[in-house]
UniProtKB/Swiss-Prot annotation:
Pfam families, per database record: HI0933_like, HI0933_like_1st
The protein's name in its UniProt record: Ribosomal RNA dihydrouridine synthase
EC number: 1.3.1.-
Similarity annotation: Belongs to the BaiN/RdsA family. RdsA subfamily.
Gene: rdsA
Gene3D superfamilies: FAD/NAD(P)-binding domain, HI0933 insert domain-like, Translation factors
Keywords associated with the record: FAD, Flavoprotein, NAD, Oxidoreductase, rRNA processing
Superkingdom classification of source: Bacteria
Cellular compartments per GO CC: cytosol
Cofactor(s) essential for the protein: FAD
Length: 400
């Protein structure tokens, strides 16, 4: 049986980065993945350009039952540290919006960078390999793969969550945690589009493809100001993806379709200047024409001129456009979700090393645990930061 200092399961962002760091420090590392190639989810991210971090990373941008858990790792390996690595590899990047950093060229550059870093550390890759069983004894862990048995002193689970099953997502990491007696919190899809109840969906389907700036608010008071997109299945766009992580089934969300306009002042000014102008054309100054026309067809916008708009109807209109209350039917689920909420309970792990408190030598990094970031590079930064924290402990084990 071949033995390694550390075996890392999952050749995604966290797994590759942790492997590279430990390998370059002299640890003998085996990196296992069930896919044909490493970094499959990285390649799909950011529209193929990989939103690899965010300039404004802070603990408040992460959801967890223990909101303090992420603080240590994020402080010890920051976005600036990862940007330094990207720069060292000569990868050109740009800020798109809200601090989101993307490769100028392709997400493949980030994958190539991580593979290169792994090769510098003499990391052994074992792709297309399924882990059939994991056992622990006094010397460490023994893994039964399809066709071979390997052993290690340290075992790192970097298998991610359940989002995007088409890219190989599975509950493997949760099963390992449960096998060793660790608590796993309920999971659900995060950063995911909303589906709508049939009557509302049928009313809005003709708007598929229309995007508008918005402010969207969850019942718990969480607010995001980003674009909203109407789709054939419901509502999407950055604002919806963000708020979906804070939404619970049965709850409403409030949507302001005119976040940059004081609608009452605007209507009063336009009424004084252009009393005979239609309300529809007035609103089309700030809203997509297709949206205005559809809302008028649905009776949400009166078919009147500005001088005919009475106070009661104006107040109802303002409420419709700035506090549109929608009760989603659900979400599109893991198939299109960018992340998985919940996972391995962080109370089971050391926030400094990511090691399981009950099981020395067993670590969890990245999305598999109950830490979920906002849209916009935050989840990649958690992958880098948690991987770095874990790697430092793998390295320290060698020196001790």
């Amino acid at each position: 049986m071949e033995r390694f200092d550390a075996i890392i399961i999952g050749a995604g962002a966290a797994g590759m980065f942790c492997s590279a760091l430990a390998g370059q420090a002299g640890r003998r590392v085996l990196l296992i993945d069930n896919g044909k190639k490493p970094g499959r989810k990285i390649l799909m991210s950011g529209g193929g350009r990989c939103n690899f971090t965010n300039l404004y990373v802070e603990p408040g941008a992460y959801l967890s039952q223990n909101p303090h858990f992420c603080k240590s790792a994020l402080a010890r390996f920051t976005q600036w540290d990862f940007i330094d690595l990207v720069n060292k590899h000569g990868i050109a990047w740009h800020e798109k919006t809200l601090g989101q950093l993307f490769c100028d060229d392709s997400a493949q550059q980030i994958v190539d960078m991580l593979v290169d870093e792994c090769e510098k550390g003499n990391v052994t890759f074992r792709l297309r390999s399924e882990v059939l069983s994991v056992a622990k004894d006094e010397t460490g862990f023994t893994l039964d793969l399809n066709g071979m048995t390997v052993g290690c002193e340290k075992l790192v689970i970097a298998t991610g969550g359940l989002s995007m099953p088409g890219l190989g997502a599975s509950p493997f990491g949760y099963k390992i945690a449960e096998q060793f007696g660790l608590n796993v919190l309920p999971t659900r899809a995060g950063l995911v589009p909303f589906t709508l109840h049939k009557p509302l969906l049928e009313e809005l389907q003709v708007l598929a493809g229309v995007a508008v700036p918005s402010v969207i608010t969850a019942e718990n008071g969480t607010v995001f100001r980003e674009n909203l997109l109407f789709t054939h299945r419901g509502l999407s766009g950055p604002a919806v993806l963000q708020i979906s992580s804070y939404w619970q089934p049965g709850e409403f969300v409030s949507i302001n379709l005119l976040p940059d306009v004081d609608l009452e002042t605007f209507l009063n000014e336009q009424r004084n200047a252009h009393p005979n102008q239609s309300l529809k054309n007035t609103l089309a100054v700030h809203l997509p024409k297709r949206l205005v026309e559809r809302l008028q067809q649905l009776g949400q916008i009166p078919d009147v001129s500005l001088k005919q708009l009475n106070v009661r109807d104006q107040q109802a209109l303002i409420s419709t456009l700035t506090d549109w209350r929608v009760q989603p039917n659900g979400t599109e689920g893991y198939r299109t979700a960018e992340v998985t909420l919940g996972g391995v309970d962080t109370n089971e792990l050391s926030s400094r090393t990511m090691e399981a408190r009950k099981v020395p030598g067993l670590y969890f990094i990245g999305e598999v645990m109950d830490v979920t970031g906002w849209l916009g590079g935050y989840n990649f930064q958690w992958a880098w930061s948690s991987a770095w924290a874990c790697a430092q402990d793998l390295i320290a084990a060698k020196s001790s």
